[in-house]
Amino acid sequence: MGLGLLLPLLLLWTRGTQGSELDPKGQHVCVASSPSAELQCCAGWRQKDQECTIPICEGPDACQKDEVCVKPGLCRCKPGFFGAHCSSRCPGQYWGPDCRESCPCHPHGQCEPATGACQCQADRWGARCEFPCACGPHGRCDPATGVCHCEPGWWSSTCRRPCQCNTAAARCEQATGACVCKPGWWGRRCSFRCNCHGSPCEQDSGRCACRPGWWGPECQQQCECVRGRCSAASGECTCPPGFRGARCELPCPAGSHGVQCAHSCGRCKHNEPCSPDTGSCESCEPGWNGTQCQQPCLPGTFGESCEQQCPHCRHGEACEPDTGHCQRCDPGWLGPRCEDPCPTGTFGEDCGSTCPTCVQGSCDTVTGDCVCSAGYWGPSCNASCPAGFHGNNCSVPCECPEGLCHPVSGSCQPGSGSRDTALIAGSLVPLLLLFLGLACCACCCWAPRSDLKDRPARDGATVSRMKLQVWGTLTSLGSTLPCRSLSSHKLPWVTVSHHDPEVPFNHSFIEPPSAGWATDDSFSSDPESGEADEVPAYCVPPQEGMVPVAQAGSSEASLAAGAFPPPEDASTPFAIPRTSSLARAKRPSVSFAEGTKFAPQSRRSSGELSSPLRKPKRLSRGAQSGPEGREAEESTGPEEAEAPESFPAAASPGDSATGHRRPPLGGRTVAEHVEAIEGSVQESSGPVTTIYMLAGKPRGSEGPVRSVFRHFGSFQKGQAEAKVKRAIPKPPRQALNRKKGSPGLASGSVGQSPNSAPKAGLPGATGPMAVRPEEAVRGLGAGTESSRRAQEPVSGCGSPEQDPQKQAEEERQEEPEYENVVPISRPPEP
């Protein structure tokens, strides 16, 4: 029962093992048709290793005793046999199953039946037994190499020479034929026995070679050594290392080792004994190394087993190998091993120097420099870390996003960057606003003005537009620039023109020097001033807030305030060089002759005029042409004869001042003022001075704040639109040409209203000559004096005996033509 169950289990185990070991690519390996698709041997084959190479011949195809199965169901004879029953051996020339393979060894050998290898005869050698042997009858050759192996008693390469030795006690060498004696025999042919009591003897001499433990000539005495061996000749004991004595029975004493204990031990630790035979120590003393502790430590090391490094000795010198002490130390160190830093307050070699004062730190023991504590730096460690650094000597940069950290710990300080940003922004915003304000002011000051005075003149009047632009610059500088002398520069012509009838007077242009100006001409109109004063000068117009006439302390203060009245005050009298053609223009215009000075020269009264004896420079300008030249030409107008009245004596110099606005003159006309001034000039003993007052009413008064904003252009447009346009009354032509024989006004002209009486008296005058010239021109300051220094043209400054009719003709020839001036026809004089 048990056996029946065991066999199926064994078969299942065998199949599983075989199936798992088969190679899918092996010979005769097939896949089972079962659903498991396991590997198995094909039909008729049996598994061998991982393949199925054993054929199966079973049943009726089973092979007989001397047959083998070569394929499933096919049997053949064993190799080397043939026949019906496979009982006959193959002939010598065949081999293999059924003797079907031919043997190449025939006829000098036979083939092995299964493999076909040749087996040569005794006298043949080679792979196919093709070589004959040369060993003779007493030798046998090797079938593979052909070397002869001689029989005993024969030697030579062919085994053909007999040996000469005792064959019972020796053998001879096959190559040389020499006899090799067996133990106990000696001699050339080994014919003598040895007498050594069982010990061998030398073959040539027969001397005994005693065995260990025996000594003597014939090895008859036994040695007495406890350890070691005795001498074969004397019997003395040769002790091994670590022992001594006659019989080597004593070990070496402590501290010695070697043969006969002749060597001393090394530096073993605590003087422990070393090994008596080898001399090695279990451990060495400090400073020594090696198995026998006889090697000192290498330079730079010390201690047990030389495992420690020497300290910083002076200049890297080696320390003591056992203690590690240094002979000298580097600066900053003390102690036997130079491991102790200098005491506090000292540094340097042998700590002999005193440290400097370190407020927040310690002194470096080597260099003496201060090593600052965390958060401080500097030569004396008295300065806190700068922003962005922390640590000792402030050498560690902060790693905070905002760049600031605690100077000691390095921790980031939140908000520090924000505070700095706010501080920077608070500083930059006012600066930016100030910059923008300055830029706006510059744009407003330098931008073209939209006032009525900026209205362009007739087409092609480029010079007039340029004059208007220069007027803006002079107006802006008027409140800050005092009267200046232009040193070595000469201004031959200064023309102040206005081209708008609604604005009484404006300074607009300073013409450049003429190309025809003579370098030796003088700018001075006063012969008493001398050549030193002949320098051109100008004065800027006064602004609001100037000192009035009543508060002026002296003529210098009055003159320094300015020479021109402000352009908005047209009623203020001011001195103008004589240009009679201005009276004929549609718009009031003023032209200054060459060499006119605008700065005061001396403290003269308003009545003083330049000397008429000085030769005018207009004669050298005869070739001048153009609009500027025509404006500068001076002619004697007929209105010169319209001033027979004389004014009272001149006022004191302190009465004239600049920067003072006088109120309007009421119902008086400009012609009345001119006649009064001319009459006063004719009666005066000095040179003739012509003073003009332009027609028109002054602008409304304005405060200082409004005046500043008007200069910046804020109120100019609005103010121009709010005011009612008023025209300056144009003087009639007949009034200008009434009297031609009177002394002409060479530098200016006076416009009159058609309804004004030419000889009407001024208010407050006691007669036609009651008003003095100083009172008519009060408030002009330097402008009055500059008019006194203006050079008089020939027609106005010539000899008083000159023919008036001739002067009138010259005036008509030299009279310039002005734009928009239409001559008015008048009836002939009675």
From Swiss-Prot:
TM stretches of this protein: 422-442
Disordered: region residues: 516-539, 581-688, 715-830
Protein name: Scavenger receptor class F member 1
Biological source species: Homo sapiens (Human)
Listed GO biological process terms: cholesterol catabolic process; dendrite development; heterophilic cell-cell adhesion via plasma membrane cell adhesion molecules; neuron remodeling; positive regulation of axon regeneration; positive regulation of neuron projection development; receptor-mediated endocytosis
Assembly and binders: Heterophilic interaction with SREC2 via its extracellular domain. The heterophilic interaction is suppressed by the presence of ligand such as Ac-LDL. Interacts with AVIL.
Topological domain ranges for the Extracellular compartment: 20-421
Cysteine-cysteine disulfides: C57-C69, C63-C75, C77-C86, C99-C111, C105-C118, C120-C129, C159-C172, C165-C179, C181-C190, C219-C230, C225-C237, C239-C248, C306-C319, C313-C326, C329-C338, C355-C363, C358-C370, C372-C381
Keyword Transmembrane: yes
